[in-house]
Amino acid sequence: MLRSLVGSEMCIRDRMHTANMMKTADFLAGLYADVIDRGLLLAGTFLHDFAKEREFTFSKLGLVTEYSVKGQLLGHLVMGAQEVSAVAAELGIPEDKSILLQHMILSHHGEPEFGAAVKPICAESELLSQIDMLDSRMEIYRETLAGLQVGEVSSRIFALDKRVFKPHELNG
């Protein structure tokens, strides 16, 4: 099933983002085992951005050049949900499971103003949305801190809506 859904190679950054999220999801699924269906959370986490690469067009060097027409019209959330629906039907996955996975993909941006088609309304979709936000924000911090000296404050970071301070050297 995963080979059918994922298809071509994902960007390295997207793969790292998903891998980081999978580790966090696995940990939090254990922490909240009384509320979370671990399998559903991990499946939704793995699939949440898999249509993202089809949202863009790429140069011969593999660099994003612009949004694809389909990416502009639908976006990766809708394209991902459509593919999950089609593949799940083809594989005989129960419709209720397919709908939950589609909901997780459609809601993982959390709020409509951040691109979500719907708000997350089950525990797994809420947790996926929070994990996605956490990992994306930490990546912004990683990139910003790498360009700062100890004791320096960055200019305003649009995606964070604030500045970033580097209080100490990084360990990594």
Predicted regions and their residues:
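Divalent metal-dependent catalytic cores for phosphoryl transfer on phosphate-bearing substrates
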Residues: 27-148
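A Trp-anchored, charged/polar loop motif used as the substrate-binding/catalytic surface
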Residues: 24
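Long, highly charged low-complexity segments enriched in Glu/Asp and Lys/Arg with interspersed Ser/Thr
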Residues: 143, 160-162, 167-168
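Glycine-rich, flexible loop/turn motifs
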Residues: 1, 63, 156, 160-161
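Single conserved hydrophobic/aromatic residue that forms the stacking wall/gate
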Residues: 1-7, 11-12
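N-terminal intrinsically disordered, cationic/polar leader segments
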Residues: 129, 153-158, 169-171
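Conserved structured catalytic cores and adjacent interaction surfaces
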Residues: 15-17
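Short, surface-exposed polybasic-aromatic patches that bind anionic ligands, especially phosphate groups
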Residues: 21
